[in-house]
Regions:
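N-terminal flexible segment immediately upstream of the FAD-binding catalytic core
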Residues: 1-107, 125-157, 309-314, 378-403, ...
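C-terminal substrate-recognition/cap domain of FAD-linked oxidoreductases
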Residues: 60-81, 284-476, 484
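Short, well-ordered beta-strand elements within core beta-sheets of diverse protein domains
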Residues: 91-97, 271-278, 344-346, 404-408
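FAD-binding subdomain of flavoenzyme oxidoreductases
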Residues: 147-303
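Activity-critical C-terminal alpha-helical subdomain
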Residues: 494-538
């Protein structure tokens, strides 16, 4: 069973602890912190009000089920659950096992004027699945039982999955046939294929496999207006692409029940290589040139100087002698205090990997890059899904961590990255609080790159103070993203936390078009209101 107030499963052995070295580092970076009292599951269950739903055979109104579906995985969600300050719950939870049952639930919702929230893996970090304050009954539809591969067409390289299939099961089922989807967001262990489509997600190796919009070939969506079936067509010039209406729709138009995806044969080999460069500017240049020269890598990730140093020392724990030795060795090769760390991946046949790996190394060397020989790339691959597990031990020690992400054209990358990070770093200066912020580029394109900033700060004297600090930090970062013409989200989606910034990206007419499309499928605003677009009670 999933943890009710954090990341992972209750029986997981992947929980993390803060060692003394990391505690000392955090104290030096943002100051000493103190733990806050944590609410229990029983504490929160006691706050669940009586349901407003009438009885239905497919709907569970048990208070614990309602608590477990009340929040996602954003920092505000974490603060709500750990403080016990949860003020909205779904009135009931349904777990359909078929498209027919989803259809039945939507007919019931339409007839009884229910608010409907689709729920995949519950991994949203921007408030996608949180109920808004409403007088209407709220029904959360958990797709977790529609979680298997329904069909595979190896000749066309297509597979059909129930929308509630989580990442590991997607890969497990495809592997039996010698295939992979290759979609590995950091939430991969818990997030679902339907959620990936609904939030327009991006996997860590999207440079090779493509983002979810490249992998999504078609599927079925149940709406209040009927069933929308999207056929799998390799290419078409027959008007607008209907798939685009569903990609990133965040449950506003309907519930995705089946997803048809484009699959790839399992690669013979995969390698991850770390290279150090003398400066951020050099690293950005190399990342841009590698992609624009079409070097066939599967991933390029570039950490700025602060992230490079932070990751090396955080990973070292109490014994940092290995990092000190690495820095000494790099210094002797011209890589000093401004160093940055690039991790690139190669995926494919053995011959392809050998050729591309060497080509990339040669290009890096031409810019003063020094290749790591100690296996840091393998370490990254081994721990690629571990970061979310760190939030609980950080929180238990009185610290908070969160992220902001965007994407901009290459010409804007250096300035945007610097200003977003600096705005976050200084957002709590009026309180005399330090914020440790650092940045990486994780998805690169010929036109530009994503920018992903992580920040750590002290929760303070109470969970409410921690929430107030988060609001200031979020606002500071988001305003810089808008000021630099970036997307308000490259991979997390809009949800509730980003909705106020969407109009800067889409424009007045664009927002009106999206709103009209939502109203076509959902004229009374019952489907996940308050997400993607501003909330309006119909």
């Amino acid at each position: 069973m999933r943890l009710w107030n954090g990341w992972g499963n209750e029986n997981s052995n992947l929980s993390m602890e803060l060692n003394n070295g990391l505690r000392m580092l955090l104290t030096a970076l943002v100051g000493p912190a103190k733990p806050l009292p944590q609410a229990t599951l029983d504490d929160v269950i006691a706050k669940v009000p009586a349901t407003k739903l009438t009885a239905h055979s497919l709907i569970n109104t048990d208070p614990e089920a309602r608590v477990r579906h009340a929040r996602g995985q954003s920092l505000p969600d974490w603060l709500d659950m750990h403080s016990g300050n949860v003020d909205t719950f779904p009135d009931g939870v349904a777990m359909p096992e078929s498209s027919e049952e989803v259809r039945e639930l939507l007919v019931h919702a339409k007839a009884n004027d229910l608010v409907v929230i689709p729920y995949g893996g519950g991994t949203s970090v921007v408030g996608h699945i949180n109920p808004e304050q409403s007088d209407k009954p709220v029904l959360t539809i958990d797709m977790g039982k529609m979680n298997s591969m329904l069909h595979i067409d190896t000749e066309s390289q297509l597979a059909t999955f129930g929308a509630g299939t989580p990442g590991p099961k997607v890969e497990e089922e495809l592997k039996k046939h010698g295939y992979t989807l290759g979609h590995f967001p950091q939430s991969w262990e818990l997030s679902t294929v339907g959620g990936w489509v609904a939030s327009r997600s991006s996997g860590q190796q999207s440079l090779h496999y493509g983002r979810i919009e490249n992998l999504f070939a078609g599927g079925s969506i149940e709406t209040l207006a009927g069933t929308l079936d999207i056929p799998t067509i390799p290419a078409s010039s027959a008007g607008p692409d209907v798939r685009e209406m569903i990609l990133g729709s965040e449950g506003r138009m309907g519930i995705i029940t089946e997803v048809k995806v484009r699959i790839t044969p399992l690669p013979e080999q995969e390698q991850f290589q770390v290279v150090f460069f003398p400066s951020w500017d050099v690293g950005i240049t190399v990342a841009r040139e590698l992609i624009q020269q079409r070097v066939a890598l599967s991933m390029v990730r570039l950490s700025n100087p602060l992230e490079t140093t932070s990751l090396l020392y955080m990973g070292a724990g109490e014994d940092s002698s290995g990092v000190v030795a690495l820095e000494q060795s790099l210094s002797e090769k011209g890589i000093g205090s401004g160093k940055v760390m690039m991790t690139f991946g190669v995926t494919g046949s053995v011959r392809h990997c050998e050729t591309v790996h060497q080509l990339a190394l040669d290009h890096c060397a031409n810019h003063g890059g020094v290749a790591d020989q100690s296996g840091l790339g393998d370490n990254w691959a081994h721990g690629r899904f571990r970061a979310p597990y760190l939030r609980d031990p950080l929180g238990a020690a009185g610290y908070a961590a969160d992220t902001m992400e965007t994407a901009v054209d290459w010409a804007k990358v250096p300035t945007a990255a610097e200003n977003i990070e600096q705005a976050i770093r200084t957002a709590l200066a009026d309180e005399g609080e330090q914020v440790h912020a650092y940045t990486h580029l994780s998805h690169v394109y010929g036109q530009g790159s994503s920018i992903y900033t992580t920040y750590l700060f002290r929760l303070g004297e109470s969970y409410q103070q921690g929430m107030d600090r988060w609001v200031k930090l979020k606002k500071a970062g988001a305003e810089q993203i808008v000021a630099h013409g970036g997307t308000i989200s490259h991979q997390h989606g809009v949800g509730r936390d980003h909705r106020q910034y969407l109009s800067a990206e889409k424009g007045t007419l664009g927002i009106a078009a999206i709103n009209n499309l939502c109203e076509l499928f959902d004229p009374k605003g019952q489907m996940n209101p308050g997400k993607l677009l501003p909330y309006s009670e119909h």
